[in-house]
From Swiss-Prot:
Residues 39-107 form the KH type-2 domain. The gene is rpsC. PROSITE patterns: KH_TYPE_2, RIBOSOMAL_S3. It comes from Rhodopseudomonas palustris (strain BisB18). InterPro entries: KH_dom, KH_dom-like_a/b, KH_dom_type_2, KH_sf_prok-type, Ribosomal_S3_C_sf, Ribosomal_uS3_bac-typ, Ribosomal_uS3_C, Ribosomal_uS3_CS. GO terms for molecular function: mRNA binding; rRNA binding; structural constituent of ribosome. This is Small ribosomal subunit protein uS3. One of its GO terms (cellular component) is cytosolic small ribosomal subunit. GO terms for biological process: translation. Transmembrane segments: none annotated.
Length: 232
């Protein structure tokens, strides 16, 4: 049987780049990697309601720059920037270095695979019919300009005794085409019947130039996201 690998990992270095962008020698690499994991865990825990899709960590000399991609930047910033100051202190406690937090607003969350997957998972937890949740997400993505979308839901769907997998697809999702700009996201719904897994693939067109930063540039220049605020 053919298995589907993570389409983001397959395209790293082609039209997508890493979410942790720094270099370290073998003596420090493990320590910095653990710091990255802790930073992401804390931010996702603190920003559950902020619709965070992606956290990019860069480490210039003796600094740590964290870029949070969120559909609700106001929730991240808080009243008069109070919440973002708390986040900066928590991250600084982990890294023991100067921390800069940037926020990028995702203007079309319906085209972000991670946010779509989390939205469907939340609906499953609220006992919304899984077919309705999947169909609504597919229609929203296609209406806003996606060239294709596929959604998989697996588990005890609708409280069934036997777990199964259901999927919807509209348009085309060319997983083998390396120049394809495919976003991928996963989420888990914790229902009273057990856990249900949600996977989402969204095809946004092709990136013809060979540039690892191409996907980030497209997001910055296009309508999907825009810088909201730089917090020094």
């Amino acid at each position: 049987m053919g298995q589907k690998i993570n389409p983001i990992g397959l395209r790293l270095g082609i039209n997508r780049t890493w979410d942790s962008r720094w270099y370290a020698g073998k003596n420090e690499y493990g320590k910095l990697l653990h710091e990255d994991v802790k930073i992401r865990e804390i931010l996702h825990k603190e920003l559950k309601q902020a619709a965070v899709a992606r956290i990019v960590i860069e480490r210039p000399h003796k600094k740590c720059r964290v870029t949070i991609h969120s559909a609700r930047p106001g929730v991240v910033i808080g009243k008069k920037g109070a919440d973002i100051d708390k986040l900066r202190k928590k991250v600084a406690d982990i890294t023991a270095s100067d921390v800069v937090i940037n926020i990028v607003e995702i203007r079309k969350p319906e085209l972000d695979a991670t946010l779509v997957a989390e939205s469907i998972a939340q609906q499953l937890e609220r006992r919304v019919a899984f077919r309705r949740a999947m169909k609504r997400a597919v229609q929203s993505a296609m209406r806003l300009g996606a060239e294709g979308i596929r959604i998989n839901c697996s588990g005890r769907l609708g409280g069934a005794e036997i777990a199964r997998m259901e999927w919807y697809r509209e348009g085309r999702v060319p997983l083998h085409t390396l120049r394809a700009d495919i976003d991928y996201g996963v989420a888990t719904a914790f229902t009273t019947f057990g856990t249900c897994g949600v996977k989402v693939w969204i095809f946004k067109g092709e990136i013809l130039e060979h540039d690892p930063m191409a996907q980030d540039k497209r997001m910055a220049e296009g309508d999907n996201s825009r810088p909201r605020r730089d917090a020094a």
